[in-house]
Swiss-Prot record:
Changing H161A: Completely abolishes catalytic activity. GO terms for biological process: nucleoside catabolic process; nucleotide biosynthetic process. InterPro entries: Ap4A_phos1/2, Ap4A_phos1/2-like, Ap4A_phos1/2_N, ATP_adenylylTrfase_C, Fork-head_TF_regulator, HIT-like_sf. Disruption phenotype: Inactivation of both APA1 and APA2 promotes a great increase in the cellular concentration of bis(5'-nuceleosidyl) tetraphosphate nucleotides. The active site is at H161 (nucleophile). Substrate binds at K53, N92, K93, N148, G154, S155, S156, Q157, Q163, N277, S278, T279, M284, K288. Its cofactor is a divalent metal cation. Its EC number is 2.7.7.53, 2.7.7.5. GO terms for molecular function: ATP binding; ATP:ADP adenylyltransferase activity; bis(5'-nucleosyl)-tetraphosphatase activity; sulfate adenylyltransferase (ADP) activity. The gene is APA2. Present with 1770 molecules/cell in log phase SD medium. It comes from the Eukaryota. This is Diadenosine 5',5'''-P1,P4-tetraphosphate phosphorylase 2.
Length: 325
C-alpha cells in the first residue's frame, strides 16, 4: 500500500535536497513544436549544460558502481514504498524536471529484466497517489512512469528502476489522441493494439480503464505481455542476423494508457545525433546544443525521423504475422 501524502513527501524532500546542495536542477528552457506532416506535438527542452557531462550510455572497462545500492539519504523519499520491502523511492540527483523520482527495486535486479506485475501495479499506484482522480488532460498535473529496458533503450544504470516525472502543462502526447474516446480492451488476432499511422516508428498502445478501481495487477500484466508479444517480433530476424545485439524497448505508463516501443539504437543518426529514451516516444525531446534546437525549430519533422532511426518501422494496419523489418 502506497503511503499517504506521497506527493507532499516528494516535494518536501526535493526542496530540502535542492536547498542543501544534495541535488542540482539542470537549467533548461522548453518550447512546444508541432510536426506539420504528422500533426504530432513535441516538447523540446534545451539544456546546454548537459553537453559537458560524459555520455552515460558509453560502456566503460570497469564495472560502474551501483548508485542505488547506498543512495544519499538526502535523496531517499522512502526506503519502503509499499510496506513490503520491495521498492524504495529516490529523487533524481540531476533532474531536468523538478521532483523527478526513481522507483527502485530494494534488492538488485537487472535493468534488462521484464517488468513484473508488482512493478506495474506499484508504478500505477504511484501515478494515482500523485495525480489523484483528476483526468483533465489540459488543466491537471499529469504524471508519466517510464522504463528504459536494454542497452538501446536509453538506459544508463544496471539496477532496475522505473522513473516518474510530471508531464509538461498543456502538452498532449500522441498516445492521448490515439486513445481518445476508446474503451479499454485486450488485443486479439482481430483487434490489434493501437498505432498512430501518421508517425513513422512502431509503437503499441492500449487504453486503460477510466476508473482506477478496475485496474489491478492481472489487468496491467495482461496489457504489458500482449504489447511485449508484438514488440518482440521485431527482434526475431534482427537477432538471427546480428546475435550480439540485445533486445531493447521502452515502456510508458500513464493513468490513461500503456505503451511499448521496440528499440534498435540508443542514439539517432545524422543530422541530430540525439540520445533518446522513453520520453522521446511520447514527444518529449532533450537537446544539448543550440544548433540542434534551431534545426528542430526549423523542421520539427526531424524528431519523427530520429525516432524511427532509434526504433523500427510502423506496422499500423498489419497483423503480427505480416510484420517486416
Amino acid at each position: 500500500m502506497i503511503e499517504e501524502n506521497l506527493k507532499q513527501k516528494i516535494h518536501d524532500k526535493f526542496v530540502a535536497a535542492k536547498k542543501n546542495g544534495h541535488l542540482k536542477v539542470t537549467h533548461a528552457e522548453s518550447k512546444k513544436l508541432k510536426d506539420p506532416q504528422t500533426t504530432t506535438q513535441y516538447w523540446v527542452t534545451f539544456a546546454p549544460s548537459l553537453a559537458l557531462k560524459p555520455d552515460a550510455n558509453k560502456n566503460s572497462d570497469s564495472k560502474a558502481e551501483d548508485p542505488f545500492a547506498n543512495p544519499d539519504e538526502e535523496l531517499v523519499v522512502t526506503e519502503d514504498l509499499n510496506g513490503d520491502g520491495e521498492y524504495k523511492l529516490l529523487l533524481n540527483k540531476f533532474p531536468v524536471v523538478p521532483e523527478h523520482s526513481l522507483l527502485v527495486t530494494s534488492e538488485f535486479k537487472d535493468q534488462r529484466s521484464a517488468l513484473t506485475p508488482s512493478d506495474l501495479m506499484t508504478a500505477y499506484n504511484v501515478l494515482c497517489s500523485l495525480q489523484g482522480d483528476k483526468d483533465d488532460d489540459v488543466t491537471c498535473e499529469r504524471y508519466l512512469v517510464f522504463y528504459n529496458c536494454g542497452p538501446h533503450s536509453g538506459s544508463s544504470q544496471d539496477h532496475k528502476h522505473l522513473q516518474i516525472m510530471q508531464m509538461p502543462e498543456k502538452f498532449i502526447p500522441f498516445q492521448d489522441v490515439l486513445c481518445n474516446g476508446k474503451d479499454h480492451f485486450l488485443p486479439t488476432f482481430n483487434a490489434e493494439p493501437l498505432q498512430d499511422d501518421k508517425v513513422s516508428f512502431a509503437h503499441f498502445v492500449l487504453p486503460l480503464p477510466e476508473s482506477s478501481d478496475q485496474v489491478d495487477e492481472d489487468l496491467l500484466a495482461m496489457c504489458y505481455v500482449s504489447l511485449m508479444q508484438r514488440a518482440l517480433t521485431f527482434f526475431q530476424d534482427w537477432t538471427n542476423e546480428s546475435p550480439e545485439l540485445t533486445k531493447s524497448y521502452n515502456v510508458l505508463l500513464t493513468k490513461k494508457w500503456i505503451c511499448v516501443v521496440p528499440r534498435s539504437h540508443a542514439k539517432s543518426g545524422p543530422p541530430l545525433m540525439l540520445n533518446i529514451n522513453s520520453t522521446g516516444y511520447c514527444g518529449m525531446i532533450l537537446v544539448k546544443d543550440r544548433e540542434k534546437l534551431e534545426n528542430l525549430t526549423e523542421d520539427p519533422h526531424l524528431v519523427d525521423k530520429s525516432l524511427l532511426q532509434c526504433g523500427f518501422p510502423n506496422t499500423a494496419g498489419q497483423k503480427p504475422t505480416e510484420y517486416h523489418y
